């Protein structure tokens, strides 16, 4: 990883630490309301009008730097694999694989072995048995 990417990963880590947990308005009052973020749209809504004690709004400034957005913390781009044939399409210099959950233990072991031969990083190898 080049020094600029490493710096941007550190910036992303700091920004994620400062980011508040965005919660839906009044989700603490009603059991039927999930905590999942929904933009407040009420005309008199305190959260929409940015009252300090009512929780933060999701805004552009909380985002990660564009160069490292969506990357795995290891610095690799995440690629979902569900067959051995898909391994040939992966570039090991900047991509790492994640084996699909529907894959059984035997096929997963084969994919991991082929990935090691090709020098590809596996993000979810599981327990070795």
UniProtKB/Swiss-Prot annotation:
- SUPFAM superfamilies in the record, alphabetically? Ribosomal protein L32e
Q: Which residues form a coiled coil?
A: none
Q: Name one GO molecular function term.
A: structural constituent of ribosome
Q: Where are the transmembrane segments?
A: none
Q: Out of the domains of life, which is the source?
A: Archaea
UniProtKB keywords? Ribonucleoprotein, Ribosomal protein
Q: Which InterPro entries match?
A: Ribosomal_eL32, Ribosomal_eL32_arc, Ribosomal_eL32_CS, Ribosomal_eL32_sf
| Gene Ontology CC annotations of this record | cytosolic large ribosomal subunit
GO BP field: translation
The protein's matches in NCBIfam families, at most eight in alphabetical order, are given as: PRK08562.1
Fetch the PANTHER family from UniProt: 60S RIBOSOMAL PROTEIN L32 AND DNA-DIRECTED RNA POLYMERASE II, SUBUNIT N, RIBOSOMAL PROTEIN L32
Q: Family assignment?
A: Belongs to the eukaryotic ribosomal protein eL32 family.
Name this polypeptide is given: Large ribosomal subunit protein eL32
Q: What is the native source organism of this protein?
A: Methanosarcina mazei (strain ATCC BAA-159 / DSM 3647 / Goe1 / Go1 / JCM 11833 / OCM 88)
């Amino acid at each position: 990883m080049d020094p600029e990417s490493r710096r941007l990963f550190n910036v992303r880590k700091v920004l994620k630490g400062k980011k508040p947990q965005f919660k839906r308005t009044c989700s603490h009052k009603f059991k039927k309301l999930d905590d999942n973020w929904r933009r407040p749209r009420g005309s008199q809504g305190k959260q929409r009008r940015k009252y300090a004690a009512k929780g933060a709004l999701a805004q552009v400034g909380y985002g990660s730097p564009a160069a490292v957005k969506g990357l795995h913390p290891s610095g690799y781009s995440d690629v979902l694999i569900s067959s051995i044939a898909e391994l040939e399409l992966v570039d090991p210099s900047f991509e790492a694989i994640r084996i699909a959950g529907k894959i059984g233990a035997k096929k997963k072991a084969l994919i991991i072995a082929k990935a090691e031969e090709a020098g590809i990083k596996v993000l979810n190898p599981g327990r070795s048995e």
